[in-house]
Amino acid sequence: MALALAWLGLILSAPLLRASGHEASAFVAYRVFAALCHQLPERSFYLDGQPLAVCARCFGIYAGFALGVVCYPLVRSLRRTDTPARRWLLLAALPTGIDFALGFTGLWANTHTSRALTGALLGAVAALYVVPGLIAFGLLIERRAQARAKILTTDFDKPFSKGGKMA
């Protein structure tokens, strides 16, 4: 959860850093997201007169994902490591794909709001697939640590014979 919120914070920090004259720090923040997003100013939300580090659609995806991670325990148990059927992820991606395709073909003039909302839906649903994987990974690490601890304590608990060798 902290990572998703920190990611969102970094997106929002770029324009604030630039607006407050911290160009070098802003440059780094924008650069981080340059590999992930086209960052077209005309397709981005603005904060303090500066574009966010990602476009409106990417911001929607990341904000939706962060919201999905925060709300995850309200929807599913943190003990579950299974994911929903893939069709739900594809269904959630459909509005984003339609919004993009209609805008690309000129049949629909998509807006920052349509991009952000369809992206947010996709991001929120994506959390239902990522969080269980992170939970499973955490459980795997925990089991391995417990197994190592058991091996170490078992080795030290064995009694020694009089000759200094293990019995």
Name every feature range the model reports, one short phrase each:
Residues 16-54:
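Extracytosolic (periplasmic/ER-lumenal) interhelical loops and adjacent juxtamembrane/interface segments
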Residues 1-24:
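N-terminal signal-anchor transmembrane alpha helix
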Residues 51, 78, 104-114:
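Membrane-interface helix caps and helix-loop-helix hairpins in membrane proteins
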Residues 51-67, 113-124:
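Membrane-interface loop-to-helix entry segments
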Residues 3-11, 68, 83-107:
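Small-polar-interrupted transmembrane alpha-helices in polytopic inner-membrane proteins
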Residues 76-83, 107, 145:
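Membrane interface segments of multi-pass transport proteins and intramembrane proteases
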Residues 60-78, 125-135:
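Membrane-interfacial alpha-helical segments at the cytosolic side of multi-pass membrane proteins
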Residues 139-167:
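Short, highly charged, low-complexity non-transmembrane loops/tails of multi-pass membrane proteins
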